[in-house]
Amino acid sequence: MGIRKYKPTTPGRRGASVSDFAEITRSTPEKSLVRPLHGKGGRNAHGRITTRHKGGGHKRAYRVIDFRRHDKDGVNAKVAHIEYDPNRTANIALLHYLDGEKRYIIAPQGLKQGDVIESGANADIKPGNNLPLRNIPAGTVIHAVELRPGGGAKLARSAGVSIQLLGKEGTYAALRMPSGEIRRVDVRCRATVGEVGNAEQSNINWGKAGRMRWKGKRPTVRGVVMNPVDHPHGGGEGKTSGGRHPVSPWGKPEGRTRKPNKPSDKLIVRRRRTGKKR
């Protein structure tokens, strides 16, 4: 993937860039693997906003991605196309299995149209192949990793990210996450070899607020510029700093969104670096 920069013909185009989509081989998705996607605009069943800054955006169709692949062990698949997916940062690959079935997977770096990949304990260690962690050698770069055996890929699915398999001891494998955290995972969990493709996606400069609106992201207004009725930081004469520790519009302290006693925390060997003073 490359990035194409625009000439500054308008203020919105100045500094803006876009993917050149050089890896994409087809522009329309496989019809049998597409489902309707209805935007909720951040509202719950009562119509109240539960997630702010969401709404609008271009109409999308959901591409059904195979995050398990365990039921296709031993069946080779040919990469028919590399496609764009508006619902994620990574590209997706359309696989044609020898038994006639078609499925989408996350497209790893280096996977090309015409490549043949497989899944199963005896699969080769090459990008796109899916194996249990117990069958992957230490030091291998992987992505789309399960947290529970058979639960489907949960980790490292975004563009350009990867996990390194550090080693195996007993029934657990040690993984270095993209955040730097080292975590133990059951060796029966499956992973796909290679790193996720479309790595340059993080370098795209969106250029203008309108492109964010196309993605369904609404403006984020600071509390200190609101009125007292709208936010605890609002009001004051002239510009003020809020006069209190940062809080949400409902008065809850900012941050601290993680559950302090998660059962899976016991599997963390080394925590990620946050840059915060403890």
Swiss-Prot record:
Q: Basic and acidic residues compositional bias: what residue ranges? A: 253-268
Per the record, its GO cellular-component terms are: large ribosomal subunit
Gene Ontology molecular function: rRNA binding; structural constituent of ribosome; transferase activity
Q: Which UniProt keywords apply?
A: Ribonucleoprotein, Ribosomal protein, RNA-binding, rRNA-binding
A Pfam family per the record: Ribosomal_L2
The segment annotated Disordered runs over 1-20, 25-58, 223-278
What's any GO biological process attached to this entry?
cytoplasmic translation
Family, per entry: Belongs to the universal ribosomal protein uL2 family.
Q: Which NCBIfam families does the protein's record reference?
A: rplB_bact
Q: What does this protein do?
A: One of the primary rRNA binding proteins. Required for association of the 30S and 50S subunits to form the 70S ribosome, for tRNA binding and peptide bond formation. It has been suggested to have peptidyltransferase activity; this is somewhat controversial. Makes several contacts with the 16S rRNA in the 70S ribosome.
Please describe the quaternary structure of this protein. Part of the 50S ribosomal subunit. Forms a bridge to the 30S subunit in the 70S ribosome.
What is the protein named? Large ribosomal subunit protein uL2
Q: Which organism is it from?
A: Mycolicibacterium smegmatis (strain ATCC 700084 / mc(2)155)
Gene for this chain: rplB
